[in-house]
Amino acid sequence: MTPPVATDAAFSHSSNGVVLSTSVDPSGTVLVIGSMTSAQSGAYQKAVEAYSGRQVEMHMVDRLTDGATSLSANTYPLAHLAVNYAEAASPVLLSSLHSALQPKAKLIVEAAELVDASTAQKVKAELIIAGFTDIQVDVATGSVSASKPATASSSFSIGSSSGSSSALPLRRKLGSGASANAKKSLWATQPASANDLIDEASLLRDADFVATTAVKRPDCDVGAGQGKKKKACKGCTCGLRELQEEEKRTANTNIVQLDTDDMDMPNADTPATTKRTEVIETIIGKDGKPKTIKRIQVDTKGATSSCGSCFLGDAFRCSSCPYLGLPAFEPGQKVEIPVGMDDDI
């Protein structure tokens, strides 16, 4: 069947009054793209009939987006899309159309649906990305029109499924050989040779080998060589002074001194000949409750035992010796037992 001859009248307007460009080839083939929805509603057939005086090439949108059909490059002076805006905004479809249209060609989208602000901006953005210019949105008719630039260099299409595109290639800027080698050595995980290893000693300064000394506060009166036990400063705020005062108070009060009567020594002196002093005191325990303790001071001078070696230490004491567990002492020395050794005292 011979296609109808193109006329200027058929090319000057579309079915719903959209004025078309007459600067393109009036005898070229018009590309009409439809969908299943537009075919069922009759919009696809109506768009084809609008160009009855021209040669029309018809395609379904899903065939183009799926890559089943390819379009010839720089062939069509006009493309008419009878699809909805979701299908028309497909980057694959718009890129393919941009490659297939001639310079200064016209693209018309008739979705037969209302165009709101968000939909129009989305379609317009996709058309700009694909490389189209002179984009116009007709809210009353629900149509969008755009043009392909006169020169291919003004397009920055993202590519098409047919493999032919007028998009500008993105070329990687090659650096010099020295910069490439420097970058390669920067990301290298292994040194090129053993000479590249850094001597750790070279990273140290002379001052790093000198032992550091602690910083001393100006009001601290604790000097070096005063013994292992630390003395609290004059203005102590760390609690050391309170701990030392508590230790001193406990050492002076929580002591029980044995009498010779408690020593169970067969040859020990009788109480009449032994000096004995008893002191009863009330102290506050760690649990906050008052406790009554008895301090007994006994002069062990002249005290003897069956073995006579109790003062030498546990190695010379029998199992019933009252001095068992105490350090060695001199004969006649006061024997003191801390309260902490027996909770019942």
UniProtKB/Swiss-Prot annotation:
How is this protein named in the record?
Fe-S cluster assembly protein DRE2
N-terminal SAM-like domain: annotated span: 11-166
The free-text domain note is: The C-terminal domain binds 2 Fe-S clusters but is otherwise mostly in an intrinsically disordered conformation.
| Quaternary structure annotation from Swiss-Prot or TrEMBL | Monomer. Interacts with TAH18. Interacts with MIA40.
Residues that bind [2Fe-2S] cluster: 220, 233, 236, 238
Any one GO MF term held by the record is:
electron transfer activity
Linker: annotated segments: 167-210
One of its Pfam families is CIAPIN1
